[in-house]
Amino acid sequence: MSEPIKLHDLRPAAGSNKAKTRVGRGEASKGKTAGRGTKGTKARKQVSAAFEGGQMPLQMRLPKLKGFKNPNKVDYQVVNIADLAEKFPQGGDVSIADIVAAGLVRKNELVKVLGNGDISVKLNVTANKFSGSAKEKIEAAGGSATVA
């Protein structure tokens, strides 16, 4: 039986690793112009990948965008009081954690309660923000709207 192959005995197959041709290293081996032809921009340097051959460049053809991104913008996840009334028909205290557990919003984000729909049960809602109509409807039903 032959000996097992060992890692230090491994060699690439003959002719599989061809040496890279080093151009511009003497007349005998692609020296002088080194395969670039004679004269001109491409013989002297690389042309920028963004250069479009004198055609108006893409970044200049596209329209400018107006406005800016407000760094102070606060994004709220919204939930309507109709959804709260549907998920909590027994009434009682409703915190942000309860709203997340009910699947109305994602966790770790701010919650705003909006006044779309009607509410008949008494809910003591705690959220990060309330619309005016939501606050009125919750308080009209006998509940309270507390900002967390």
UniProtKB/Swiss-Prot annotation:
Amino acid composition bias (Basic and acidic residues), ranges on this chain: 1-11
Entry annotated with the keyword Plastid: no
Domain of life, source organism: Bacteria
A GO term for molecular function: structural constituent of ribosome
Pfam families attached to this UniProt entry: Ribosomal_L27A
Keywords for this protein: Ribonucleoprotein, Ribosomal protein, RNA-binding, rRNA-binding
Gene3D superfamilies noted in UniProt: 3.100.10.10
Location of the region described as Disordered in the Swiss-Prot/TrEMBL record: 1-52
GO cellular component term, pick one: cytosolic large ribosomal subunit
Entry keyword Iron-sulfur: no
Annotated GO biological process: translation
Family: Belongs to the universal ribosomal protein uL15 family.
Function: Binds to the 23S rRNA.
Record's subunit section: Part of the 50S ribosomal subunit.
Protein name in UniProt: Large ribosomal subunit protein uL15
